A protein has these predicted regions:
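N-terminal helix-turn-helix DNA-binding core of bacterial DNA-binding proteins
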Residues: 3-4, 8-41, 66-77
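Hydrophobic alpha-helical segments
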Residues: 24, 62, 84-88
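Short alpha-helix boundary/capping motifs
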Residues: 29-30, 41, 56-57, 80-81, ...
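Short, hydrophobic-biased segments on the C-terminal half of alpha helices
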Residues: 49-50
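Beta-hairpin "wing" of winged helix-turn-helix
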Residues: 53-63, 70
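Hydrophobic transmembrane alpha-helix bundles
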Residues: 61-67, 79-83
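Phospho-regulated, low-complexity intrinsically disordered regions of nuclear gene-regulatory
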Residues: 73-91
Length: 91
């Protein structure tokens, strides 16, 4: 998960999905280009999405020809919960 979060482009993708969940690859690429002037190819963004999916930070599902991507904050929540629980046990 930390490796997935280390890349600034992947963090921007997560920001976009947090702002507007359920986007296609085309929508994500368009928004990244407009908002951040990011010149990454669709293939590069697709690879970034696969890393985020592998880390459990993004989920996707197909509807016909379209594949929609959704942010999943569960892994981050479990991590912060673990740190909080450890902190309360120590106090």
């Amino acid at each position: 998960m930390f490796k997935a979060l280390a890349d600034p482009t992947r963090r921007k993708i997560l920001d976009e999905l947090a702002e507007r969940d359920g986007q296609t690859l085309f929508e994500i690429c368009s928004r990244l280009t407009m908002k951040y002037q990011l010149g990454s190819s669709r293939q590069a963004i697709s690879q970034h999405l696969e890393v985020l999916i592998g880390a459990g930070l993004v989920t996707s599902h197909r509807e016909g020809r379209y594949k929609f991507h959704y942010i999943d904050t569960g892994p981050l929540q479990r991590l912060t919960d673990r740190w909080r629980n450890r902190e309360t046990k120590e106090n």
